[in-house]
């Protein structure tokens, strides 16, 4: 009886310590901090990929990368799960024309506070580069088709 209580208490402690480590995400999604992430291995244009992500979850968008730590998490998740594809991966960054000014912003509306561009050019949408093991960004034409990653704010 004493051993049962001890083991039960130990399992409870482990469960409680793990439950605060990330977001509560659906079973086929990965979590980092308070967000949920899903790799989608379907080829879509940037616009179609963003639409797909918005249909998967409330406030779902193509992934925004807001810090170096998040960039490392995303790159490692992609490297572990995308081994054979020759395609780059859409992220939620795009160039927006606002009147006569252009600015880059994430599809979820968050500001660009972290950047890891290969070379800026006039193309409007951004991918994570397969050749860099998904650690650098490059802008490409939005009409190209790539696989992509979705992100949404999970529940705690």
Swiss-Prot record:
Reported tissue expression: Expressed by the venom gland.
Disulfide bonds: 25-36, 53-150, 125-142
Membrane-spanning ranges: none
Domain C-type lectin: 24-151
GO molecular function terms listed in the Swiss-Prot or TrEMBL record: toxin activity
Keyword Signal: yes
Superkingdom, natural source: Eukaryota
PROSITE patterns: C_TYPE_LECTIN_1 (PS00615), C_TYPE_LECTIN_2 (PS50041)
Compartments it resides in: Secreted
UniProt signal peptide: 1-23
Function, in words: Weakly agglutinates platelets at high doses by binding to GPIbalpha (GP1BA).
Miscellaneous: Monoclonal antibodies to glycoprotein IIb/IIIa, to bovine vWF, and to bovine serum albumin did not show any effect on the binding of AL-B to platelets.
Record's subunit section: Heterodimer of subunits alpha and beta; disulfide-linked.
Stated family: Belongs to the snaclec family.
Protein name: Snaclec alboaggregin-B subunit alpha
Organism (species): Trimeresurus albolabris (White-lipped pit viper)
């Amino acid at each position: 009886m004493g051993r049962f209580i001890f083991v039960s208490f130990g399992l409870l402690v482990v469960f409680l310590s793990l439950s605060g480590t990330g977001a509560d995400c659906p079973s086929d999604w990965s979590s980092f901090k308070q967000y949920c992430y899903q790799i989608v291995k379907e080829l879509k244009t940037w616009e179609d990929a963003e639409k797909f992500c918005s249909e998967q979850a409330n406030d779902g968008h193509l992934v925004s990368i807001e810090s170096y730590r998040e960039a490392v998490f995303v790159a490692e998740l992609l490297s572990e799960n995308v081994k054979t594809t020759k395609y780059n991966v859409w992220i939620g960054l795009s160039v927006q024309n606002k009147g006569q000014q252009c600015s880059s912003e994430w599809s979820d509306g968050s500001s660009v506070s972290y950047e890891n561009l290969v070379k800026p050019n006039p193309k409007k949408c951004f991918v994570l580069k397969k050749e860099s093991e998904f650690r650098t960004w490059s802008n490409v034409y939005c009409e190209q088709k790539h696989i992509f990653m979705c992100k949404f704010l999970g529940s705690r």
